[in-house]
Amino acid sequence: MIKVFIAGATGWAGSAIAKGVYNEKGMQLAGGLSRFNKQENLAEILDFGNDEIPLFGTIEEALEQVDFDVLVEFTKPDIAKKNILSALNKGKKVVVGTSGLTNEDYTEIEKAANDNNT
């Protein structure tokens, strides 16, 4: 079972990805990140029924409190870079859907991924 955490989980793209992950066999939606709905139940916000899926306001909180394998990143570039680097530095795999990152950002992200064997 692949445990997936989504940054930007209540946005238009993030919520669509969350629904896909939630319904996919072999995947578990471990939690989400939202600057607007922190401390709420993602399952309730996205109408998944009675499940409890934690929602956090910062990646640091999530990394301390939730076990996940993969971060799917769909926020804004300035937030995304911090989220990506934090996850990579904790040994998490990362999928980036955020646009607007610079070549310098990607160079730094690639170095962090290589340094952490992710």
Predicted regions and their residues:
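Gly/Ala-rich phosphate-binding loop of Rossmann-like dinucleotide-binding domains
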Residues: 18, 22, 88
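Rossmann-fold NAD(P)-binding glycine/threonine-rich loop
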Residues: 85, 89, 98-118
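Rossmann-fold NAD(P) dinucleotide-binding segment
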Residues: 63-65, 70, 74, 78-96
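NAD(P)-binding Rossmann-fold cofactor-contacting core
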Residues: 23-48
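N-terminal Rossmann NAD(P)H-binding glycine-rich loop of SDR-like oxidoreductase domains
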Residues: 7-10, 14-19
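Extreme N-terminal starter segment of soluble prokaryotic enzymes
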Residues: 1-5
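Short acidic low-complexity segments
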Residues: 51-65
